[in-house]
């Protein structure tokens, strides 16, 4: 039932709004609204009841295991939520004077310093509100760098085929042509293809390391030399930073610019699709172009650096300073874990992934890159199973829902057929992993004995399989009270 | 180990299964020369008790003020239910609803949001949110250019929020899109129509139309919309969602209505929070839906014909279309939209109207009171919604400092963005302000003016 | 799965506790604990996950309609929760000096004044932590009053048979003998029986009005005269105060002492069984005996009245001042509703009850007191249905659970066979009541066509019918790790 | 109408169905002369925004202090998860779990609570909570009298919390039960064994044994328990639940262990909140279970043999047994127990031990520091847990006021309850206090003593 179906004309909930309409109204008549917007008229209780019940229809980290590759679904500490929501933080206006926000700004400054250290970069801007915006900022800075050096012939960005879709989409949004390079059998970038692709048109290379194939790109140093030698810059997509936190710094791998997804590595909540935050770090050479605002600490006082302080900045990317509340949560998370906790994250995330890979392999699942260590994730391919039984990766994914597990990422990366990208994250216990393995075994058995049942999954969810073809064909994006 | 549940026995068993001797061995594919990961700037971990105390102290340091600042972010009462529900684990810690069957809660809520937001804007459809108002405007500009096909120029009045213009420039510049600015009329604070008419013969993909504009002033939106349509440009509205309860919605502007309406969703139940997270909303006409960036939810059925919801039109998106996608956008501001949907549901049409009307009435009353003070006059002679520009006869920065010392944040200085507007404050009094608050502001301003004279 | 079954030896969650054991320990060895208590060793995430999932197994006001007679299950406004939990209120020590708690004490004082007005009593003490404790206080004051007047021969408390079980239990706890008096056919107290019962042994009468039969005791004024004439006092059980709020004041009905359940009438949360709060109001004659502490307002300052100020007080009933946080919630609730809201509560609670009674009667359900107005609740008796079909009130109750409604109160009051005591409360909408009526009709139809299915309910809950005979016979009250 | 969803049309339709002309008519059975319900002291309703502002102001008025007060209510760190989960609607707004199938969440949690609490106390069984520590002790006294059958006298040391003794007297007096007090030894702060022995020949239903006692001092619990058992009295323990992580649990006291152990549950994750709501816990030996008041949850199965939970032994309770019930208790403190269970689960045995051990160590350290100040000495020469009595050489009330002016709440005056203990402070430093906090207390006390000298 939609909230609108609980609505009844002229039902009023006065306690949430002023008790009367005011007398004063200077709005000229021709600018006044005449129609009533379609907002529901329901009681506070029915609103609470409706959305409480809706919430119960979601899977979430707080209720289920989410082995969702490339998404780093780890526990979101409850203290990060409540401390970031202290009333003074919530009520502070973004344009309030800096001296009324020194507590907040201290957190932001320290977060910048911590992220610089973790990534090995020269400076960090916190403004980016999501990974894709981080990429946009990074590539915009690469463009600004080349332009500042009069190097205007560089029109191409090189991207491995395993990359997230955001990488090529970002390059295009920044006015670049995308040169895709292939992956070799072991999951590494094809170095010959890279060498062939670089040249005077190369503006830069975007790389995720460990890659979305779940393996560490061993020749990253050589890639850096090749791209730099050709005059290009290196962009690090920090989607998988969780896998190497405290082990390797992107700066040490030779990257010039990096974004890190705080909603992955730093455990800010995914919130059903956002908000994220993706601070951007740069090496010395890109420092002038970093977007503002940035927090400075001068003579014991924190202040915003703006366009006046940074005349070469690419500018602003949000009305204020990005997703401040998300940044606070990440700050609290890092302070809770501390330096020693950073190492542990990557260690236990890697341990969990390799354990799960080993156990699934023992069950008979085919590992896409069987000769490699898993980073914090790994890929199972269902190709052989599908060829033999008709059961697809998606069928298995839906069947896992029935068993109380969120599905792994399916059909990404695109180059592995019928793939499941599995990332358990460090916060899951061995018992939970073992329960997941047991469920995978049950499904293997079901595929053998009743493949049609598996193909028709899910069975035990509030809904059977959703018809998304119909959703796209018969577009119904807003509710029509007329039916 | 905070948040890591492994016991020593677990680790031993897991390593045995893997066939490795140590966790360290699992990192053996990383070249040794790259392993330089010593962290020197990350302090040792704190217990939850310790970080709690630190954060309470920092929050106390920032304190509470009686604030009359608006300028794009607005203090409104947020019903307690909004965030108590929004932070439930099932909303807070869930992922993007790609697995529709396991995400019907979020999906249905987003469909309800789309319905509410489209109706509020008087438009046909809505997406499920963008990052914030400024970036939503930039995306609207890109969308207009894609739709228009021939022009890569956007016409933007200087009455649009200065930072929105700045963000838009940062984003569209990469695609060689030109942003052309139209000055404001210093008497009315509205778009200078005579200046606009100088562009009458040039081609533009879109005209951006703010309502209310950055000065709080109401623009002649019908005329502006028709002006754009007359020259085959798109009309892109930038609107305050609270004001839409009172003001003619973009879909009804001019003869045909705006084509795209975007804005900052923060006023709909999102705390000020030093600037974020907020959310951008984007609504448009049906015919533009395939050009719209961001996630969109559709209502459909399951295999048994039961109503359900799913992400749709994913073929526009980067995870499917990669370099040919409409936008690179992936993450949106789902949790903020959750809050906004609950907020709109709690208020309903009449509640939102009252919030808007009291915000308007309070600002009108405040301006009337302040104008009576010697040395204060309105900068513009135009109707306004819930913000107004006031020109002082003395240095305004000093006045603001004096107010602050009395616990009052008196507004923002327009001079920072509009060099011609010397000593001019932009002030805002939402429904949160009582008559006593307005009197307090009047009194401390009177004192500050006297002290500065 | 029990939380203990998620436990694993030596798993540690350091962030919730100090990171190490301290060096100093002066506890003598023979007083030290040697055994490890059976607390679970689980991660923060698994604790959150376990209890989040458990919560989803509950019915609650925030998710379901709860037509639970005599319990007044109404909406618990969310603002009452968050405002009562402001950090300063939570962190205030009960023994902190009064001048560091003037904000809190102002709320308590105003609540006392408001409750005095609502009940028409001379004074109110907030100390009682539950209805049953309110009763204990009331009867203890009655005893103190008689003792102070040297009237020591009064050993009996008169209680109508429809009363809550707490009434007779309280009287016995206070050392009294209970004289039960019957109810007449119309649901009123049998006046002849009352007259026969009163006498020199009568310490007092306990009365709920409107009674638990859902009707207003019309002859309450006469009852008051009879009891007072015999030298007894009148106790008002405020369980049903919601039904007459702002309409009649218990003080005006002649009562000497009253408790009111804030967790009913003033919408503080039931919390799965508490905490409650039940302030006690007294008429002038009982004022000296009121339990301490009480808040006084003198020269603009709030302070506690203690035994020194009230030498005849019966004393203290809690270590501090009762359930302060519950009182704060009730205070916020009353301030939200205001004087005009008090009237509305009883009006709409009564409207909802009479509407539901009318609709159920139309369906063919037998109303226990068909010639009476419903107060805020009413009784359906399933006796005829049970005699005819074997389907009991409990069967119907369980079947309602299947349909997403909490069951009404069953088998109370004891004098009506196979009864359902139904109280919809004022916060439910007509649509919800109509859906409930529709469900009751469905069940009536099911009783006609498939009574055995109804008898076997529930069917669609996480569990089938619980075996509570086994629970009592094979007592298993704590988990044994040995199995 | 806040919280009332009826529209005018709804009301009209409902009245038609009922056959009444007005809502007022529904009250026609109330005699007119009783309808005098005009409310004069209830202010007009406030919007949520208005009450929010009022409550924020009152909270700000009360402020934050560095507190060293204990005396029965203790400041401990409460993990954020505790109340975020506890206030979920499904726990917060649910009723007593009488309908077991619709209440498995609460029921299972309470079963887990009973297990944890019984184990912590070293006892066989636990109920699902009582109102608070003081009333739990009174119920334990009644229970002991019921069990003992011949004596109606209870022996209570004066080292038991004075208010607990007061509450117990209020409650048991009605049943003509006599409370006999045993003085403390002024040197040790423990039960005066010689005074106790004077009662050796008299019959008592129970001896109450506090651990730690009100002075924070550790009693010789083994000897006291055996003393009680030797004369066929029950041994009733009153214990602090945090301390149980470090101290020998009541079930192991003496040769046979205490018979009943009760206490205040507040230290287990419940905020101080000006005194409530807290919860009382009660645990006992198996053979006393049918004498135990309050709700008890049992594990059982459903009709299909699936594990489930239900209220059990209801035949003891007032709603079944009425005047023959074990107690009149109905409502308990369910939500508080929800919080306590989550708290204990988050901390685990080692976490709770550390909380206890740091509270102990901090108090030891504080006492050592303070003792070095001239004019401060320990009142008693005995080991203590996390509270200690300190005697000052100057008027202690004035000292406390000076500390308060510095933002420090220095403890409570024992003189209010123990006239012999002049100028004696009871101080407590839990794990929430840092070394800097202890130093601050030491320094402000030094200054206050100097100023008062």
UniProtKB/Swiss-Prot annotation, chains A, C:
The keyword Ribosomal protein is annotated on this UniProt entry: no
Highest rank taxon of the organism: Bacteria
A GO cellular component annotation in the UniProt record: glycine cleavage complex
Keyword Oxidoreductase: yes
Catalytic activity: N(6)-[(R)-lipoyl]-L-lysyl-[glycine-cleavage complex H protein] + glycine + H(+) = N(6)-[(R)-S(8)-aminomethyldihydrolipoyl]-L-lysyl-[glycine-cleavage complex H protein] + CO2
Modification N6-(pyridoxal phosphate)lysine occurs at: 264
Sequence segments annotated as region (Disordered): 1-33
GO molecular function, one term: pyridoxal phosphate binding
One Pfam family recorded for the sequence: Aminotran_5
Keywords, comma-separated and alphabetical: Oxidoreductase, Pyridoxal phosphate
EC number: 1.4.4.2
SS bond list: none
Cofactor(s) the record lists: pyridoxal 5'-phosphate
Any one biological process term the GO annotation gives: glycine decarboxylation via glycine cleavage system
Enzyme class, spelled out: oxidoreductase
Assembly information from the UniProt record: The glycine cleavage system is composed of four proteins: P, T, L and H. In this organism, the P 'protein' is a heterodimer of two subunits.
Assigned protein family: Belongs to the GcvP family. C-terminal subunit subfamily.
HAMAP family: GcvPB
NCBIfam families: PRK04366.1 (NF003346)
Family annotation (PANTHER family): GLYCINE DEHYDROGENASE (DECARBOXYLATING), MITOCHONDRIAL, GLYCINE DEHYDROGENASE, DECARBOXYLATING
Function: The glycine cleavage system catalyzes the degradation of glycine. The P protein binds the alpha-amino group of glycine through its pyridoxal phosphate cofactor; CO(2) is released and the remaining methylamine moiety is then transferred to the lipoamide cofactor of the H protein.
UniProt name for this protein: Probable glycine dehydrogenase (decarboxylating) subunit 2
Protein species of origin: Nitrosomonas europaea (strain ATCC 19718 / CIP 103999 / KCTC 2705 / NBRC 14298)
This protein's encoding gene: gcvPB
Swiss-Prot record, chains B, D:
One Gene Ontology term from the biological process aspect of the record: glycine decarboxylation via glycine cleavage system
InterPro entries referenced in this protein's UniProt entry, alphabetically: GcvPA (IPR023010), GDC-P_N (IPR049315), GDC_P (IPR020581), PyrdxlP-dep_Trfase (IPR015424), PyrdxlP-dep_Trfase_major (IPR015421), PyrdxlP-dep_Trfase_small (IPR015422)
GO MF entry, a single one: glycine dehydrogenase (decarboxylating) activity
Enzyme class at the top of the EC tree: oxidoreductase
UniProt KW Membrane keyword: no
Gene3D superfamilies according to UniProt: Aspartate Aminotransferase, domain 1, Type I PLP-dependent aspartate aminotransferase-like (Major domain)
Membrane spanning residue stretches: none
Pfam families to which the protein is assigned, alphabetical: GDC-P
Catalytic reaction(s) noted: N(6)-[(R)-lipoyl]-L-lysyl-[glycine-cleavage complex H protein] + glycine + H(+) = N(6)-[(R)-S(8)-aminomethyldihydrolipoyl]-L-lysyl-[glycine-cleavage complex H protein] + CO2
Keywords: Oxidoreductase
EC number: 1.4.4.2
Family, per entry: Belongs to the GcvP family. N-terminal subunit subfamily.
Described purpose of this protein according to its UniProt entry: The glycine cleavage system catalyzes the degradation of glycine. The P protein binds the alpha-amino group of glycine through its pyridoxal phosphate cofactor; CO(2) is released and the remaining methylamine moiety is then transferred to the lipoamide cofactor of the H protein.
Subunit structure: The glycine cleavage system is composed of four proteins: P, T, L and H. In this organism, the P 'protein' is a heterodimer of two subunits.
HAMAP family: GcvPA
Protein name: Probable glycine dehydrogenase (decarboxylating) subunit 1
Gene designation: gcvPA
């Amino acid at each position: 039932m939609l909230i609108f179906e609980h609505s009844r004309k002229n039902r009023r909930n006065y306690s949430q709004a002023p008790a009367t309409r005011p007398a004063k109204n200077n709005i000229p008549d021709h600018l006044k609204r005449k129609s009533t917007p379609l907002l529901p008229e329901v009681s506070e209780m029915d609103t609470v009841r409706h959305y409480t019940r809706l919430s119960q229809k979601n899977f979430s980290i707080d209720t289920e295991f989410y082995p969702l590759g490339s998404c780093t679904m780890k526990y979101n500490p409850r203290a990060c939520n409540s401390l970031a929501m202290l009333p003074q933080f919530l009520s502070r206006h973004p344009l309030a004077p800096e001296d009324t926000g020194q507590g907040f700004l201290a957190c932001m400054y320290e977060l910048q310093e911590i992220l610089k250290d973790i990534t090995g970069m020269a400076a960090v801007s916190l403004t980016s509100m999501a990974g894709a915006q981080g990429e946009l900022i990074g590539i915009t800075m690469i463009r600004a760098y080349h332009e500042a050096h009069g190097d205007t012939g560089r029109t191409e960005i090189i991207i491995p085929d395993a990359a997230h879709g955001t990488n090529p989409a970002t390059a295009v949004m920044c006015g670049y042509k995308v040169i895709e390079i292939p992956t070799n059998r072991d999951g590494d970038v094809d170095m010959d293809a890279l060498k062939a692709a670089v040249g005077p048109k190369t503006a830069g290379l975007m790389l995720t390391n460990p890659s979305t194939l779940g393996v560490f790109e061993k020749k990253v140093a050589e890639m850096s030399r090749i791209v730099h030698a050709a005059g290009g810059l290196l962009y690090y997509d920090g989607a998988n930073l969780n896998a190497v936190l405290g082990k390797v710094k992107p700066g040490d791998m030779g990257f010039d610019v990096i974004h890190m997804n705080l909603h992955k590595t730093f455990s800010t909540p995914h919130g059903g699709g956002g908000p994220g935050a993706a601070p951007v770090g740069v090496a010395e050479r890109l420092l002038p172009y970093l977007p503002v605002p940035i927090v400075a600490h001068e003579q014991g006082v924190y202040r915003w650096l703006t366009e006046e302080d940074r005349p070469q900045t690419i500018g602003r990317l949000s009305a204020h300073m990005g997703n401040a509340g998300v940044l606070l949560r990440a700050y609290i998370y890092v302070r809770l874990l501390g330096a020693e906790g950073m190492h542990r994250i990557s260690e236990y995330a890697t341990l969990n992934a390799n354990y799960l890979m080993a156990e699934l392999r023992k069950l008979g699942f085919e590992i896409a890159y069987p000769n490699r260590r898993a980073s914090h994730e790994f890929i199972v391919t269902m190709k052989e199973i599908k060829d033999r039984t008709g059961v697809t990766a998606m069928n298995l994914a839906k069947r896992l829902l029935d068993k109380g597990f969120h599905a792994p990422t399916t059909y990404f990366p695109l180059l592995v057929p019928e793939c499941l990208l599995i990332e358990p994250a460090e916060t899951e216990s061995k018992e939970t992993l073992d329960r997941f393995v047991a469920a995978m075994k049950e499904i293997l058995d079901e595929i053998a004995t009743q493949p049609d049942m598996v193909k028709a999954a899910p069975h035990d969810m509030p809904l059977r399989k959703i018809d998304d073809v119909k959703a796209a064909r018969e577009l119904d994006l807003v509710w029509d009270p007329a039916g | 180990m905070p948040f890591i549940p492994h016991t020593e026995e677990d680790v031993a068993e897991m390593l045995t299964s893997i066939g490795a001797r140590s966790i360290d061995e699992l990192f053996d594919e990383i070249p040794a020369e790259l392993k330089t990961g010593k962290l020197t700037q990350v302090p040792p971990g704190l217990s939850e008790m310790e970080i709690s105390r630190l954060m309470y102290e920092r929050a106390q340091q920032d304190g509470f003020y009686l604030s009359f600042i608006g300028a794009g972010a607005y203090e409104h009462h947020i019903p307690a239910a909004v965030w108590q529900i929004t932070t439930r684990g099932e909303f807070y810690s869930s992922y993007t609803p790609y697995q529709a069957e396991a995400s019907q809660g979020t999906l249905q809520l987003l469909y309800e949001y789309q319905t509410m937001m489209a109706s509020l804007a008087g438009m046909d459809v809505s997406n499920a949110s963008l990052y914030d108002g400024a970036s939503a405007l930039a995306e609207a500009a890109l969308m207009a250019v894609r739709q228009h096909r021939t022009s890569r120029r956007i016409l933007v009045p200087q009455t649009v929020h200065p930072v929105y213009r700045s963000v838009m420039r940062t984003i569209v510049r990469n695609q060689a899109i030109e942003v052309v600015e139209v000055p404001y009329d210093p008497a009315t604070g509205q778009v200078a129509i005579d200046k606009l008419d100088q562009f009458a013969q040039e081609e533009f993909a879109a005209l951006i139309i703010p309502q209310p504009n950055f000065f709080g002033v109401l623009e002649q939106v019908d005329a502006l919309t028709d002006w754009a349509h007359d020259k085959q440009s798109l009309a892109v509205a930038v609107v305050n969602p609270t004001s839409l309860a009172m003001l003619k919605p973009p879909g009804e502007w001019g003869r045909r209505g705006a084509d795209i309406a975007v804005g900052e969703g923060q006023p709909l139940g999102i705390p000020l929070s030093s600037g974020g997270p907020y959310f951008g909303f984007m609504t448009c006409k049906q015919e533009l839906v395939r050009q719209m960036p961001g996630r969109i939810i559709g209502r459909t059925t399951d295999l048994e014909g039961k109503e359900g919801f799913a992400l749709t039109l994913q073929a526009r998106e980067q995870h499917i279309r990669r370099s040919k996608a409409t936008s690179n956008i992936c993450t949106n501001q789902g949790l903020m939209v959750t809050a906004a949907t609950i907020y709109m549901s709690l208020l309903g049409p009449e509640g939102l109207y009252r919030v808007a009307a009291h915000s308007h009435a309070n600002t009108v009353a405040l301006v009337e009171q302040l104008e009576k003070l010697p040395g204060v006059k309105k900068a513009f002679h135009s109707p306004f919604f819930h913000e107004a520009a006031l020109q002082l006869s003395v240095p305004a920065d000093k006045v603001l400092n004096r107010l602050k010392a009395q616990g009052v944040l008196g507004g923002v200085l327009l001079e920072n963005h509009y060099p011609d507007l010397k000593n001019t404050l932009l002030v805002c009094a939402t429904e949160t302000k009582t008559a006593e608050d307005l009197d307090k502001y009047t009194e401390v301003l009177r004192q500050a003016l006297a002290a500065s004279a």
